[in-house]
Amino acid sequence: MIGGRDAAAWIQPCLGTGALETTVEMMLLKKILRTPVVTEPLVRAESEEQVEVIGRQIDAWAQRVLGRSLHIREVDAGSCNGCELEIIALNNPYYDVERFGLHFVASPRHADCLLVTGPVTRNMADPLRRTYDATPEPKIVIAIGDCAIDCGVFAGGYGVIGPVSAVVPVDVIVRGCPPTPQTVLAGILAALQTHG
């Protein structure tokens, strides 16, 4: 019996249609039908209170160090985009970092902080240097993710020059593959504290 029905009742419509050609397929279908639903419970990795505390601290430190809100430019130096997804999540309604005065900007000329992801590839070394040079002081640079720190799985690849620190000075590293949005926020806070 499967779900209150005999397995034959589930399999019967498939017979004669060519859908179940071999006994292996038959056995697989029976196994699928006998296996109960297996899921892991939803675990909330971060609490709203922790995000709120870190966000308020970032806002206070930004006011202390810069006298205004923090403006961030994200730079993908050659990543797989896993870290970018976590950084982009900072703007979703759950984190909503705009309420803490964190603003993502399109131009490095308007940025106080660079979030750099991925190992630096040959094609991105010069653009990364120019982005760093265009950023006004205090030029806070945060290497986000394992690949930005030590090239991760891309280490030794032909197109990879090295970690972010080989191209521009790095103030803070944020470990993880990818790091969670809360970990990224903690890294931003640590960077502001080092400049304060």
What are these regions (language model features)?
Residues 1-78, 89, 94-97, 105, ...:
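Iron-sulfur (Fe-S) cluster-binding modules
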Residues 78, 119-121, 147-149, 179:
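Short glycine-rich anion-binding loops that position phosphate/pyrophosphate groups of nucleotides
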Residues 101-110:
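Short acidic low-complexity segments
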Residues 110-131:
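Mid-length scaffold segments of soluble, non-membrane domains
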Residues 125-127, 152-154, 184-185:
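Short glycine-/acidic-enriched loop or helix-start segments at secondary-structure transitions
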Residues 127-143:
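A short, gly/pro- and small-residue-rich
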Residues 139-150, 177:
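Catalytic nucleophile loop
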